[in-house]
Amino acid sequence: MSASAAILLAASESGHSDENVLIPPLSELLIGTLAFGLLVAFFFWKIRPQIARTYAQRTERIEGGIARAEAAQREAQALLEQYRAQLTEARAEAARIRDDAHTEGRQIVEELRASAQREIAEIKERADAQLAADRAQIVAQVRREVGVIAIDLASKIVGYQVESTATQARLVDDFIAALDNSAEGAGSSTPAPVGSGG
């Protein structure tokens, strides 16, 4: 015999075959309903406000956290925009400084080049003047020496001693002029004869 058959047999022997097991007695139903009502009233009176308060606090914390997060995000976005603006400004400033430096560098190079050209021109001018002065001095010295040598030679060749300084100077000038003319290629003729002095 199975267990379910044994239970059915015990139930039928109890003698309460008229009663429905699913419908409780009225007294139990009233007491159960009253207890449930008290439990619901206690829940709405004590527990529900605490739950609502906790729920409100949690909602407030969540919304406050969201608001703080949004504020922090806005602040971060503003800082990012400010950083980008400063970075753009710094790049523009760096480009301007670089361009100014290039311009200044070119100006300095041009100034140095112009200054060097002026110095070169001045040095060349001084050198030319010095060369001209040295040449004039050397030419004068050579003329004197050549004149003395020419007079000595003329005196030895002619056998006549030129005593006068004016005559010596005229003879030297004539001789040097003749040498200059032949050196310049004025002609291929022989130098003019030196005049006899008296």
UniProtKB/Swiss-Prot annotation:
Asked whether the UniProt record includes Membrane among its keywords, one would answer yes
Q: Does the keyword Heme apply?
A: no
As for subcellular location, the record says: Cell membrane
Spell out the Pfam families in the cross-references.
Answer: ATP-synt_B (PF00430)
Q: Which Gene3D superfamilies match?
A: F1F0 ATP synthase subunit B, membrane domain
- Major localisation: membrane
**Highest taxon of source:** Bacteria
Citing just one GO molecular function, the answer is: proton-transporting ATPase activity, rotational mechanism
Q: Which SUPFAM superfamilies match?
A: F1F0 ATP synthase subunit B, membrane domain
Keywords in alphabetical order: ATP synthesis, Cell membrane, CF(0), Hydrogen ion transport, Ion transport, Membrane, Transmembrane, Transmembrane helix, Transport
Q: So where does this one cross the membrane?
A: 25-45
Q: What GO cellular-component annotations does this UniProt entry give?
A: plasma membrane; proton-transporting ATP synthase complex
Topology in the lipid bilayer is annotated as:
Single-pass membrane protein
Complex and partners: F-type ATPases have 2 components, F(1) - the catalytic core - and F(0) - the membrane proton channel. F(1) has five subunits: alpha(3), beta(3), gamma(1), delta(1), epsilon(1). F(0) has three main subunits: a(1), b(2) and c(10-14). The alpha and beta chains form an alternating ring which encloses part of the gamma chain. F(1) is attached to F(0) by a central stalk formed by the gamma and epsilon chains, while a peripheral stalk is formed by the delta and b chains.
Record's family? Answer: Belongs to the ATPase B chain family.
What is known about what this protein does?
F(1)F(0) ATP synthase produces ATP from ADP in the presence of a proton or sodium gradient. F-type ATPases consist of two structural domains, F(1) containing the extramembraneous catalytic core and F(0) containing the membrane proton channel, linked together by a central stalk and a peripheral stalk. During catalysis, ATP synthesis in the catalytic domain of F(1) is coupled via a rotary mechanism of the central stalk subunits to proton translocation.
Protein known as: ATP synthase subunit b
Gene for this chain: atpF
